[in-house]
Amino acid sequence: GGLAMEDVLNPRHGNPRIATELAGAALIARGVDVRTIRLPQVHDTTRAGLITPLAAQARRAGAVAYLGEGSTRWSAAHVSDVAKLYVLALEQGEPGARYHASGEEGVTARSVAEAIGKGTGLPVRSITAEAVDHYFGWMAPFAGLDMGASNAWTRARLGWEPTGPDLLTDLAAMDYSRLEGA
């Protein structure tokens, strides 16, 4: 799929966040000032969104897996950049606007898996669609989603400039032995 854009609200999209966006749209229709921040994989060297439980699952399974060629993407942003965006959205944002907190438009699943593999010392492998539910468990619905997101509009409207470390840098510095569930 293509990059998610801030000006698009697709009520049939498979991303679970659609429920909060629809609730926000209903409030906007009633005159409430709502500003939506679409969060990516928010990370630092201690946690990384859905990647943290993915790393814990890899330790339990004895291998790090990604679906198919690993070409699906997850947008990402350092926690300090996301915090700055919340402030900008409150101070300068427009009622009803949606903003993407994407410091990076999309990091491939394979790159993430390889970083986890290097950090944990576990082998990295591709799995088939048939094995996704078994390996990923509750995270299976996310394994095949291409969740890249553009931040061009957000940057232009709010002057937001992400400056924090990128996802792969934080994953390289993460202490995987300290992860919850590891």
Question: Positions of the model-derived regions?
Answer:
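Glycine/proline-rich active-site loop of Rossmann-fold NAD(P)-dependent oxidoreductases
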Residues: 18, 43-54, 88-99
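Amphipathic alpha-helical segments that line or abut small-molecule/effector binding pockets
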Residues: 80-88, 114, 168, 172
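Conserved beta-loop-beta element that borders a ligand/cofactor-binding pocket
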Residues: 22-45
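Conserved C-terminal active-site "lid" loop/helix of NAD(P)H-dependent oxidoreductases
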Residues: 110, 114, 133-161, 177
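Mid/C-terminal beta-alpha module of Rossmann-like enzyme folds, strongest
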Residues: 85-139, 179-182
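Amphipathic terminal alpha-helices
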Residues: 165-182
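Active-site "gating" loop of Rossmann-like NAD(P)-dependent oxidoreductase/epimerase domains
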Residues: 1-15, 22, 29-30
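A conserved pocket-lining segment of Rossmann-fold NAD(P)-dependent short-chain dehydrogenase/reductase
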Residues: 56-77, 81, 85
